[in-house]
Design a protein with these regions (language model features):
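Alpha-helical residues within the helix-turn-helix
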Residues: 26, 37, 71
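A short, Lys/Arg-rich alpha-helix, primarily the initiator
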Residues: 2-28
Length: 85
């Protein structure tokens, strides 16, 4: 079998939900640490530093994390994927 290599382009974002996570977090007046603490109650463990990297689109996000973020932020999953043009 041929091996497929993943090409990493450091100039490209690793997720598209980061800016919306930040937007909804700030709308609620929450710090990154508070969001991390609230996620632990589900329990989904994303530390404050990982939330920062997620919001900066540096970190990838799993489907479980996306569902937990939407639930914790009180928004539909689709809202995390909305793009502002």
């Amino acid at each position: 079998m041929a091996r497929i290599a993943r090409i990493i382009d450091e100039d490209q974002p690793n997720n598209i939900i980061g800016p919306n996570v930040r937007k909804y977090r700030l709308e609620r007046g929450w710090s990154q640490q508070l969001l991390a603490n609230k996620l632990e109650l589900i329990p989904v463990y994303i530390c404050r530093g990982s939330i920062s990297r997620l919001e900066e689109q540096i970190r990838t996000v799993t489907d479980f994390e996306i569902a937990a973020l939407a639930e914790t932020l009180g928004v539909p999953i689709e809202a995390l994927f909305a793009r502002e043009d």
